[in-house]
Amino acid sequence: MKIQTDAANVLQRASAQLKSGLLKEKPLWYDIIAKYPPTSTNDLIKKSHVYEGKSDPRNNSIIYKYPNSNNKNNNVLFKTRPSNKELKSKNHNIHKLPKLKFIEDSLRKIFYQQHPWELSRPKNLIDNGNGNNNEKCDWSHMLQLHKPLDGESVVQRTLWLLKNNTTKGLTMVEAYDKARFEFYKLRMSEEMESHVAKEESTMYGSVFTSTTVNWNLSKEQEYINDWTIIAKERTQVIEANMNKSSAPIGSVVEEEKSQSSLFEDLLSNDNLQSEPEVEQSGQQQQQEQPKQETN
């Protein structure tokens, strides 16, 4: 982008217009701009910093000597690399959005790492419109009317203890432990109430059907049983096909099949020798029959 010089040359243009008569009166800002002129265009260009002297020991080997001069003062050191201080001061992440960090996130991370099975409990995501669902909650106590008991209750209770406990200064760990033990007591009481209610209902003759999870598992087991029968049939077919030799002639499988005992070889040779004798005797009988007919 081209550097704009109109604002920097405003004093020169106003002076030229006053001399030429385009401006009848001197502007009110003329004397102020003349006393404190704006920065020139040369000041807008960043210049490299030059060290004078031998303050930087890294540049001792980089010395430029003017020709035909024996004066030591003519030696000038030039900076060739940024210093560690300048490297640290560089803001490389100037265009990167900063990551927002909240205490609630760290508390949630710690709680669910210590209690992973709390994540398996079903939750209802309810939004009242304004995005703040904790307005009706009073975190001076753990149990709430408009919110079920979960890990978020521990987080909000811990923050309330840190802000409102003025009598005794609690640390983060102490407030978290206090909220966590309150959560344990309420969770155990809920489980005891559910067990007692189930025992009372069974005592009065109520029958509990299978849950949705058990029903899904039973349906899945039915399909598995059907597929076991099909798998057995298919494996039998595959094994039967594997027993059939599909090896080419002359292979090891064919040689093993062609191997026979000595007794089997002798029997086969005797059969081959007896077959031509039977054929010859049959031909002689056929020749004798027409001779008898002629006689």
From Swiss-Prot:
Predominant place of localization: mitochondrion
Residue stretches of biased makeup (Low complexity): 273-289
Keyword terms: Mitochondrion, Ribonucleoprotein, Ribosomal protein
Annotated spans, Disordered: 249-295
Record-linked CDD domains: At1g26750
Domain of life: Eukaryota
InterPro entries cross-referenced by the UniProt entry: Ribosomal_mS23_fun
Localization annotation: Mitochondrion
Pfam families registered for this protein in UniProt: MRP-S25
Coiled coil region boundaries: none
GO molecular function term, any single one: structural constituent of ribosome
Cellular component aspect of the GO annotation: mitochondrial small ribosomal subunit; mitochondrion
Subunit structure: Component of the mitochondrial small ribosomal subunit (mt-SSU).
Family of this protein: Belongs to the mitochondrion-specific ribosomal protein mS23 family.
Chain's role: Component of the mitochondrial ribosome (mitoribosome), a dedicated translation machinery responsible for the synthesis of mitochondrial genome-encoded proteins, including at least some of the essential transmembrane subunits of the mitochondrial respiratory chain. The mitoribosomes are attached to the mitochondrial inner membrane and translation products are cotranslationally integrated into the membrane.
Name by which UniProt lists this protein: Small ribosomal subunit protein mS23
